[in-house]
């Protein structure tokens, strides 16, 4: 492609809301242009990157035995009413009606239409397993769309849905899709981690997220430095301490005056207590109106997902109000503790491991020291209710846990019959009986992975793409292209030769100043820069720069061809 035949729309102007590097660089490089809040035009260079990602996704899905189809983007309300999602989805579901006043929505996801298609066309186990996918534009009416295409209202997603007779067949395809997603991200060239994830309202036992590692990631993921264990912070756990090794303390409980100390931070800073000897007692109320005291070590944080999954808790829970707490304890938050606690205690393993702990005295301005489990507090339950922290022992006891930020670009689930059962998507099984098909679903954020790639790899000058998805593999940057016949001749011939070799190349024939050409090339992120000028041509040389390493070399064209091949 010649630069004069496409639209290179680089700019220095940025809107105030562009806070992420990926958002800033996509706008500055002219990859996208904002049309409305959370809605973007894909400019030629941006679309080229997007199409390269789509091609990799499509190639790997096809290799995995999936078949592509295309579902409508506008969905009738009747389908979502079958699964009760017409009302449950909330304001993110963009609803509309046609001239006949029939209700429709812009598809935020496509479980219902794929099941509707399947129930009309799949009748027997002999047609299974079947894995179908699409690459489709979706719309979710986010209240505050932000971060550019990272969290846009309109986005492009690959969503696949598999159909099965039994759980083992579903698990086999799930494992195939897990490997396929790894292949996709490997082929793109991103650093990532598959992590065990919460299934949420969908339920089931199996769910994994695919997280691209990046400082700007909204998700926190943990992984072992000694094994392949990895999980989202919501689900991550740790090796439980051996409570049988606790030392029986001979120290007696002491009540101390702690005026105006209502936080753990003040307790260990002003009273010089070891924070790992302190505990936090927080009161919650579950959906059944039952109150519980949740106890964790002073330097730990509660994990909402784990708590809602406890058998004792009727989810969802809420934090008790100050008034509710005072009516139970006759004390305020910040002074609560486990000694003579009037409600059921659920304590984290790490809190249970402490001897001679420090806690509130259930009396304002007082704390107890030297409190011990089993000796002083006997009525309690133990559960994993906290977020893991760096240094925790991995649950497989291989290495310790480390935390990092990630951007979720893929999520796979075993849906089982969550959608097929209410929509009566049944087949005749091998036993001759009718039963709901089992399903898996596999989402991949095509437009999101583009932003994630930028977040993972960039510098102060612009984007450093993985070469597999760079808008152009090579940029020829001729100095005085429209003034020097020799420069034009060499640049044009090299351009044609590279095209003939199947190399994706851009010839910057705009006649722009060298500084403008070089700045645009760095900003847009072409993988290889070839500078052609009269001075070097006199020596039979051109200048080559690798965008990723910034290494520059003065080499011959023959040497350049070897590098590019």
From Swiss-Prot:
Magnesium found in the keyword field: no
SUPFAM superfamilies: Class II aaRS ABD-related, Class II aaRS and biotin synthetases, YbaK/ProRS associated domain
Gene Ontology CC: cytosol
Main location per the UniProt record: cytoplasm
GO molecular function: aminoacyl-tRNA deacylase activity; ATP binding; proline-tRNA ligase activity
Cited InterPro entries: aa-tRNA-synt_IIb, aa-tRNA-synth_II, aa-tRNA-synth_II/BPL/LPL, Anticodon-bd, Anticodon-bd_dom_sf, Pro-tRNA-ligase_IIa, Pro-tRNA-synth_IIa_bac-type, Pro-tRNA-Synthase_IIa_type1
Keyword Aminoacyl-tRNA synthetase found: yes
Top-level taxon of the source organism: Bacteria
UniProt-listed CDD domains: ProRS-INS (cd04334), ProRS_anticodon_short (cd00861), ProRS_core_prok (cd00779)
GO biological process, alphabetically ordered: prolyl-tRNA aminoacylation
Catalytic activity annotation: tRNA(Pro) + L-proline + ATP = L-prolyl-tRNA(Pro) + AMP + diphosphate
Keywords (A to Z) from UniProt: Aminoacyl-tRNA synthetase, ATP-binding, Cytoplasm, Ligase, Nucleotide-binding, Protein biosynthesis
Enzyme class: ligase
Pfam families listed in its UniProt record: HGTP_anticodon (PF03129), tRNA-synt_2b (PF00587), tRNA_edit (PF04073)
Localisation: Cytoplasm
Protein's job: Catalyzes the attachment of proline to tRNA(Pro) in a two-step reaction: proline is first activated by ATP to form Pro-AMP and then transferred to the acceptor end of tRNA(Pro). As ProRS can inadvertently accommodate and process non-cognate amino acids such as alanine and cysteine, to avoid such errors it has two additional distinct editing activities against alanine. One activity is designated as 'pretransfer' editing and involves the tRNA(Pro)-independent hydrolysis of activated Ala-AMP.
Family of the protein in this entry: Belongs to the class-II aminoacyl-tRNA synthetase family. ProS type 1 subfamily.
Domain notes: Consists of three domains: the N-terminal catalytic domain, the editing domain and the C-terminal anticodon-binding domain.
Subunit structure: Homodimer.
Protein name (record): Proline--tRNA ligase
Protein's organism: Francisella tularensis subsp. mediasiatica (strain FSC147)
């Amino acid at each position: 492609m010649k630069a004069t035949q496409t639209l290179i729309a680089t700019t220095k102007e940025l809107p105030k809301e562009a806070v992420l590097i990926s958002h800033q660089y996509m706008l500055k490089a002219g990859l996208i242009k904002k049309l409305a809040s959370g809605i973007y035009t894909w400019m030629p260079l941006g679309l080229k990157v997007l199409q390269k990602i789509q091609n990799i996704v499509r190639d790997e899905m096809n290799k995995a035995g999936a078949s592509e189809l295309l579902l409508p983007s506008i969905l009738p309300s009747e389908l979502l009413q079958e699964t009760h999602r017409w009302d449950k989805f909330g304001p993110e579901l963009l609803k509309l009606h046609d001239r006949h006043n029939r209700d429709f929505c812009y598809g935020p996801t496509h479980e219902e239409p794929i099941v509707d298609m399947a129930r009309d066309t799949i009748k027997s186990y002999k047609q299974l397993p079947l894995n179908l996918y699409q690459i489709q534009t979706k719309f979710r009416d986010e209240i505050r769309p932000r971060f550019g295409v990272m969290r846009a209202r309109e986005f492009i997603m690959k969503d696949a849905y598999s159909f099965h007779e039994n759980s083992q067949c579903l698990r086999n395809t799930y494992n195939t899709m897990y490997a396929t997603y790894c292949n996709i991200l490997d082929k793109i060239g991103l650093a990532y981690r598959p992590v065990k994830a919460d299934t949420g309202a969908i339920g089931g036992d199996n769910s994994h997220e695919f997280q691209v590692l990046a400082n700007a990631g909204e998700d926190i993921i943990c992984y072992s430095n000694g094994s392949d264990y990895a999980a989202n912070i919501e689900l991550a756990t740790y090796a439980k301490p051996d409570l049988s090794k606790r030392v029986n303390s001979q120290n007696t409980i002491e009540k101390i005056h702690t005026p105006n100390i209502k936080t753990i931070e003040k307790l260990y800073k002003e009273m010089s207590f070891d924070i790992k000897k302190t505990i936090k007692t927080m009161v919650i109320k579950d959906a059944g109106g039952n109150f519980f005291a949740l106890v964790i070590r002073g330097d730990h944080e509660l994990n909402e997902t784990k708590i809602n999954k406890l058998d004792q808790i009727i989810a969802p829970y809420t934090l008790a109000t100050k008034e509710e707490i005072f009516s139970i304890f006759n004390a305020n938050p910040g002074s609560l503790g486990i000694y003579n606690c009037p409600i059921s205690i659920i304590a984290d393993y790490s809190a249970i491991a402490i001897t001679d702990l420090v806690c509130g005295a259930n009396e304002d301005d007082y704390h107890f020291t030297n409190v011990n489990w089993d000796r002083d507090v006997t009525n309690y339950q133990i559960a994993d209710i906290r977020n893991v922290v760096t240094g925790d022992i991995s649950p497989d006891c291989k290495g310790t846990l480390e935390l990092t930020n990630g951007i979720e670009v893929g999520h796979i689930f075993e849906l089982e019959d969550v959608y097929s059962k209410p929509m009566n998507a049944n087949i005749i099984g091998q036993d001759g009986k009718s039963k709901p098909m089992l399903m898996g679903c596999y989402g991949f954020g095509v437009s999101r992975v583009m932003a994630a790639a930028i977040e993972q790899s960039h510098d102060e000058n612009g984007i450093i793409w993985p070469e597999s998805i760079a808008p152009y593999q090579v940029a020829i940057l001729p100095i005085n292209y429209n003034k020097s016949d020799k420069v034009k001749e060499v640049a044009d011939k090299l351009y044609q030769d590279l095209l003939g070799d199947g190399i994706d190349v851009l010839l910057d024939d705009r006649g722009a100043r060298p500084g403008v050409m070089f700045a645009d090339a760095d900003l847009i992120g072409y993988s290889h820069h070839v500078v052609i000028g009269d001075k070097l041509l006199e020596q039979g040389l051109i200048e080559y720069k690798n965008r990723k390493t910034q290494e520059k070399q003065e080499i011959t064209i023959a040497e350049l061809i070897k590098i590019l091949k």
